Amino acid sequence: MHSKLNIQSKQLYKIFLLIVGSILGAILRWKLNNYFWVNISGAALLGLIVGLRAGSRIQFFLVIGFCGSFTTFSGWILDVFDLFRTGFFWKAAGLICSNLLGGFTALSVTFWIGRKIRHLFIPQ
């Protein structure tokens, strides 16, 4: 019985982390209201978290909760679609390339930074 309660409390704690992270991510996304910087900074945060090898609770809170609601593929792709639909093909292509390249670069750089920081505090 005790282990069943322990498992249930861990699940509730994960749900709590998910809810709080999601709310904070959604509020910040709403306040920034700029798909490009939201997606780039979200990718950078993901890179840092993974590079640091943060604990599972921190990853659950930040990766699934916060970044899951903070970054916004659907809003961004709607902007791309509207540009294509209205004949701004080069702007749409530029938006696609800048977000993909920017997001990949931000994640790669912050992953590397996270690994360096981790090695400073936790030598191998």
Swiss-Prot record:
Na(+) is not transported, but it plays an essential structural role and its presence is essential for fluoride channel function. Na(+) binds at residues 68, 71. Signal peptide: none annotated. One of its GO terms (cellular component) is plasma membrane. The chain crosses the membrane at residues 7-27, 32-52, 58-78, 93-113. It catalyses: fluoride(in) = fluoride(out). The keyword Glycosyltransferase does not apply. GO terms for molecular function: fluoride channel activity; metal ion binding. Keywords: Cell inner membrane, Cell membrane, Ion channel, Ion transport, Membrane, Metal-binding, Sodium, Transmembrane, Transmembrane helix, Transport. It is a multi-pass membrane protein. GO terms for biological process: cellular detoxification of fluoride. InterPro entries: FluC. Fluoride-specific ion channel. Important for reducing fluoride concentration in the cell, thus reducing its toxicity. HAMAP family: FluC. Belongs to the fluoride channel Fluc/FEX (TC 1.A.43) family. This is Fluoride-specific ion channel FluC 1. It comes from Prochlorococcus marinus (strain SARG / CCMP1375 / SS120). The gene is fluC1.
